[in-house]
């Protein structure tokens, strides 16, 4: 919806918008879902039971079906994009274009094959990149201490700790830090080598109290010591590794936060183990296959799943008396982000793109991008600083095939950059569908020896697909289109995509174009439940958008979401949706009011222009016009940085607070006047002008209700509000001084309401006079400019505006001794000081206010009294009520005259009659006849105000006596009974 709002906004600005939607259709999630549909559970079954061709077709069918469902969901909430022309990453043209990135990486010397220890999913039988290892579970694993016997010594052992017993069969060497202090520790007649600083913790964990440190020494003394592998007789392959079983220095890789300070190292199952092993020339030992099972070389453990093998390994260690201690540990362990299987580390051959070569360029390009909010830049920069080479190959089926062919004769590597290039060198016909298994059958002629080259079986990391969208989505001739459209103006996704899509786009852009492919990145938050938890069906807190749409409609959902600060998570709230519904009702009613009165007066907006009528506008009309243009200006500034939430709040708050709750209340009486005066025409035109432009802009947020309002409200409307263009703000009509004056007026109104409440004076009762005292000349001038508006707002006969000094005639000072402070300071003298203050209040107050202090002579002592000792407050004189606002004070009389009370009563009666008109669903032009039964003492009052009542209620006649009509109601007004009947005049 955020994307949709931004695209709609750019359209109403008159811009040509590239709004092609797209779907990532490859990858493990679709493979796993397809496996479930086919009733299979592993990779081998795809090959043996289903067949790769059938499986690929089913994956494609599943992906396209889900894409269609997503399209309908997007359309349902008003997402307006080019749905007839989406891109799919499975399209042959997309795959063909994407190959150009891999070809470019090869040409730059960034693509090669290498061995590395990587996370591997034994269920999915594929590797995972670092950024794919993002999901963890709390798992319970063994926590064991194992004794490695030192060769040539009778009872001396290296003590190691591990939580992965299954890696011990692949052990090659032991790592230490030569600069640490180590100790020979005697336990039960055996000598254990442990880092000195870990002895106490290890013995405590093993519940051993009877031990003795025989000596301590530097780790350098251990370097080169050889040991016997504890499982040598169970794993025959270990007999070939005897020469490598020794202690080596690994520096700070070895820590003293846990373990023993000696680290068992399996070069095939640990990244640091692999790195250190390479440094010392040790072999890469890995006895585990793609399914996570021990191979033939695993000896006794052949065929066992590695995690299952741990139990057997521990049992064998016990039998050989090499298990020192066995415990359990619950720790955060990485699982496959798709199937949730615990991952393992394996040393495997993979294809890499050496992106570390362009790390500095990436960081430079990040600086050039507009990141919204700013913290997006620091997060992605920190990630790039820790960048590692990209493992691009995956051992799966449903993905973009890697365009790498290797000659069977000379091992020459050939990388293809497009389908067209492949066709030019292919020995076999190139299929239209570039997926496996069809692409696997295409051989090419080696450009080095003329031999036959075959494609490697791997597919690309699924993030490769999304990372090339900026150009691959443009089709076959993407180079020409990119010249016209590139770079991408905006990329928008959730904050999780900083390490996902945003990064993969950046990476591909640097490889292909030597620059970031985008100029701005906007990050959005996620939907949480009311407690701030992530929504999951498994937690029972997930709310389907369709349920919200069914209950409240699309626009309410859109408005509520778009109001939330874009990059912050939003807490779902039914109450917030209900409040949003009320706001939409206010918006609707605002247009109903405008339409009704304009239609009644046959107002024709196309006969006028703003420049023509502006000279007839009243001060409140100029104010709303200024507020509108100021709002447009703010929207314009906010949307330069795509701050959708700011635009949404500016638009909605303007219509509700400025137009509906303020301006319309000010102009309602003018709209009721029969004659079409020039100022009334000006009022109508300005209201029409701002509402028309408002609904055009609002269509970017609430398109459904905007479409309905637009077609019924706008004269000579186009086919759709989406075909309209928005105007820019006009500086000529922005009057900041006037806006500030009205802000003060609103404060004055609030202060007046507060004063009325204190005095118990109803709002409908007019005030004879309101006194307004202003603190500074500038504000005084502003308020003076809108005196007539204030009279109407305050329901006053007159107002008097003057400087703050004038308030003195309505105030007096209340002076009280601060007894606690005086008592602490003056002890025994305090009663006399308090008495003095109470007897000299006025002079003390004047001195402190004017001179900051008053000097009192008490018992021949000069006592200096200031604001710490004397509490001075200002009170309003008897008969009046005051209320403060930020720029001054409002004063009203507590007393209401008989005439004012009468007018208040009449207004209460009018309000009841207008309510009854609504109950009869009368048109605003319809006349009525009124009959009333009122208290006898009120008859003369009604007769006195008869013409006023008739004009305000559109009544042709008022009869006092028995109440009758089309509707009759009994009203209690100020404790008196008024029975009122009305009927439509014939």
UniProtKB/Swiss-Prot annotation:
GO terms for biological process: isoleucyl-tRNA aminoacylation. Transmembrane segments: none annotated. This is Isoleucine--tRNA ligase. Monomer. It is found in: Cytoplasm. Its EC number is 6.1.1.5. It holds the Pfam family DUF5915. Catalyzes the attachment of isoleucine to tRNA(Ile). As IleRS can inadvertently accommodate and process structurally similar amino acids such as valine, to avoid such errors it has two additional distinct tRNA(Ile)-dependent editing activities. One activity is designated as 'pretransfer' editing and involves the hydrolysis of activated Val-AMP. The other activity is designated 'posttransfer' editing and involves deacylation of mischarged Val-tRNA(Ile). Keywords: Aminoacyl-tRNA synthetase, ATP-binding, Cytoplasm, Ligase, Metal-binding, Nucleotide-binding, Protein biosynthesis, Zinc. Belongs to the class-I aminoacyl-tRNA synthetase family. IleS type 2 subfamily. Its main location: cytoplasm. GO terms for molecular function: aminoacyl-tRNA deacylase activity; ATP binding; isoleucine-tRNA ligase activity; metal ion binding; tRNA binding. PANTHER family: ISOLEUCINE--TRNA LIGASE, MITOCHONDRIAL (PTHR42765:SF1), SOLEUCYL-TRNA SYNTHETASE (PTHR42765). The keyword Nucleus does not apply. It comes from Saccharolobus solfataricus (strain ATCC 35092 / DSM 1617 / JCM 11322 / P2) (Sulfolobus solfataricus). A motif ('KMSKS' region) lies at residues 534-538. Its cofactor is Zn(2+). Coiled coil: none annotated. One of its GO terms (cellular component) is cytosol. ATP binds at residue 537. IleRS has two distinct active sites: one for aminoacylation and one for editing. The misactivated valine is translocated from the active site to the editing site, which sterically excludes the correctly activated isoleucine. The single editing site contains two valyl binding pockets, one specific for each substrate (Val-AMP or Val-tRNA(Ile)). It catalyses: tRNA(Ile) + L-isoleucine + ATP = L-isoleucyl-tRNA(Ile) + AMP + diphosphate.
């Amino acid at each position: 919806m955020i994307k949709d709002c931004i695209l709609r906004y750019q359209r109403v600005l008159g811009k040509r918008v590239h709004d092609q939607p797209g779907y990532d259709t490859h990858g493990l999630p679709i493979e796993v879902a397809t496996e479930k549909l086919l009733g299979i559970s592993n990779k081998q079954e795809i090959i043996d039971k289903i067949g790769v061709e059938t499986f690929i077709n089913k994956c494609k069918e599943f992906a396209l079906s889900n894409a269609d469902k997503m399209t309908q969901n997007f359309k349902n909430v008003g997402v307006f994009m080019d749905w007839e022309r989406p891109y799919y990453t499975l399209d042959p043209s997309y795959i063909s274009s994407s190959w150009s990135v891999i070809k470019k990486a090869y040409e730059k010397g960034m693509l090669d094959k290498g061995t590395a220890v990587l996370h591997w999913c034994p269920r999915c039988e594929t590797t995972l990149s670092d950024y794919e290892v993002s999901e963890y579970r709390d798992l319970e694993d063994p926590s064991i201490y194992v004794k490695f016997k030192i060769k040539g010594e009778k009872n001396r052992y290296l003590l190691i700790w591990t939580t992965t017993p299954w890696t011990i069969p692949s052990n090659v060497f032991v790592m230490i830090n030569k600069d640490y202090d180590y100790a020979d520790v005697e336990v039960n007649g055996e000598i254990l080598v442990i880092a000195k600083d870990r002895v106490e913790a290890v013995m405590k964990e093993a519940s051993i109290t009877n031990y003795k440190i025989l000596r301590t020494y530097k780790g350098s003394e251990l370097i080169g010591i050889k040991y016997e592998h504890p499982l040598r007789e169970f794993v025959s392959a270990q007999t070939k590794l005897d020469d490598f079983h020794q202690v080596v220095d690994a520096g700070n890789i070895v820590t003293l936060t846990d373990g023993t300070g000696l680290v068992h190292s399996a070069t095939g199952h640990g990244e640091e183990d692999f790195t250190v092993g390479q440094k010392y020339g040790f072999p890469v030992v890995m006895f585990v296959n793609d399914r996570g099972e021990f191979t033939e070389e695993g000896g006794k453990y052949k065929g066992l799943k590695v995690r299952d093998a741990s139990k057997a390994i521990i049992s064998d260690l016990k039998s050989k008396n090499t298990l020192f201690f066995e415990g359990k540990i619950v720790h955060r362990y990485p699982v496959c982000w798709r199937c949730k299987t615990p991952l393992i580390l394996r040393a495997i051959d993979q294809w890499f793109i050496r992106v570390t070569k362009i790390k500095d360029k990436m960081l430079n390009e990040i600086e050039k991008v507009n990141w919204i909010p700013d913290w997006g830049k620091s997060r992605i920069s920190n990630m790039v600083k820790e960048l590692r080479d990209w493992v691009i190959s995956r051992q799966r089926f449903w993905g973009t095939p890697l365009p790498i062919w290797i000659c069977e004769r000379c091992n020459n590597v050939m990388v293809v950059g497009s389908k067209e290039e492949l066709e030019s060198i292919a020995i076999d016909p190139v299929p239209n569908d570039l997926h496996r298994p069809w692409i696997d059958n295409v051989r090419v002629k080696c450009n080095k020896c003329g031999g036959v080259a075959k494609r490697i079986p791997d597919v690309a990391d699924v993030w490769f697909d999304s990372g090339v969208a900026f150009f691959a989505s443009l089709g076959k001739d993407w180079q020409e289109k990119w010249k016209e459209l590139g770079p991408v103006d905006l990329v928008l996704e959730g904050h999780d995509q900083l390490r996902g899509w945003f990064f993969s786009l950046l990476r591909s852009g640097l490889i292909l174009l030597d620059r970031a492919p985008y100029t701005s990145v906007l990050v959005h938050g996620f939907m949480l439940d009311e407690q701030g938890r992530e929504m999951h069906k498994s937690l029972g807190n997930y709310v389907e958008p369709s349920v919200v749409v069914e209950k409240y409609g699309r626009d309410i959902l859109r408005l509520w979401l778009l109001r939330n600060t874009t990059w912050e998570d939003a807490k779902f709230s039914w109450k917030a949706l209900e409040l949003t519904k009320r706001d939409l009702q206010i918006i609707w009613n605002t247009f109903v009011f405008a339409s009704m009165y304009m239609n009644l007066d046959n107002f024709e907006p196309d006969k006028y222009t703003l420049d023509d009528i502006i000279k007839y506008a009243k001060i409140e009309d100029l104010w709303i016009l200024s507020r509108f243009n100021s709002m447009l200006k703010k929207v314009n500034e906010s949307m330069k940085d795509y701050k959708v939430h700011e635009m949404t709040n500016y638009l909605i708050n303007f219509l509700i607070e400025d137009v509906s709750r303020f301006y319309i209340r000010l102009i309602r009486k003018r709209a009721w006047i029969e004659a079409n005066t020039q100022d009334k025409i000006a009022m109508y035109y300005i209201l029409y002008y701002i509402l028309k432009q408002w609904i055009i802009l609002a269509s970017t947020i609430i398109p459904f209700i905007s479409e309905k309002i637009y077609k019924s409200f706008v004269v000579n409307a186009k086919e759709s509000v989406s075909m309209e263009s928005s105007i820019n703000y006009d500086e000529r009509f922005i009057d900041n001084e006037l806006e500030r004056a009205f802000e003060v007026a609103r404060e004055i109104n609030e202060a007046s309401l507060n004063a009325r409440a204190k005095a118990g004076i109803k709002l409908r009762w007019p005030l004879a006079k309101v006194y307004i005292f202003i603190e500074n000349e500038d504000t005084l001038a502003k308020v003076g400019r809108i005196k007539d508006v204030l009279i109407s707002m305050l329901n006053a006969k007159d107002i008097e505006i003057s400087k703050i000094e004038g308030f003195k005639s309505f105030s007096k000072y209340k002076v009280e001794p601060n007894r606690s402070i005086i008592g602490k300071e003056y002890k025994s003298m305090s009663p006399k000081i308090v008495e003095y203050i109470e007897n000299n209040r006025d002079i003390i107050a004047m001195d402190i206010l004017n001179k900051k202090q008053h000097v009192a002579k008490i018992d021949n002592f000069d006592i200096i009294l200031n604001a710490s000792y004397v509490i001075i407050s200002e009170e309003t004189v008897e008969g009046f009520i005051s209320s403060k606002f930020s720029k001054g004070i409002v004063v009203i009389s507590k007393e209401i005259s008989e005439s004012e009370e009468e007018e208040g009563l009449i207004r209460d009666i009018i309000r009841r009659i207008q309510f009854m008109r609504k109950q009869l669903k009368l048109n605003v032009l319809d006349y009525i006849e009124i009959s009333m039964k009122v208290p006898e003492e009120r008859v003369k009052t009604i007769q006195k105000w008869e013409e006023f009542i008739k004009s305000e209620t559109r009544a042709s006649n008022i009869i006092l006596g028995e109440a009758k009509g089309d509707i009759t109601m009994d009203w209690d007004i100020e404790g008196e009974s008024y029975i009122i009947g009305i009927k439509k005049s014939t």
